[in-house]
C-alpha cells in the first residue's frame, strides 16, 4: 500500500459504533495509543471492519480534528 500521507499508524479495531450514516471506529495502534475515527457506515461495511481486524489509521494534517470533554 502506497499513500501520500506521512502519518500511517498500524493497529487493530477495538470497537465499532455503527449508525445509519456514520460509524465510529476505535483503533488501538501498535504503540498502544488509541485513535477514534468517524467514517461512513458504507465505508465500514465495504472494508468489512470488525473487532480485532488489522487496520491502518491514515492521518493528513489538513484533516485532523481536536476536541475536549468540556
Indicate residue ranges for each PLM-predicted region.
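Non-catalytic connector elements of ABC transporters
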Residues: 1-70
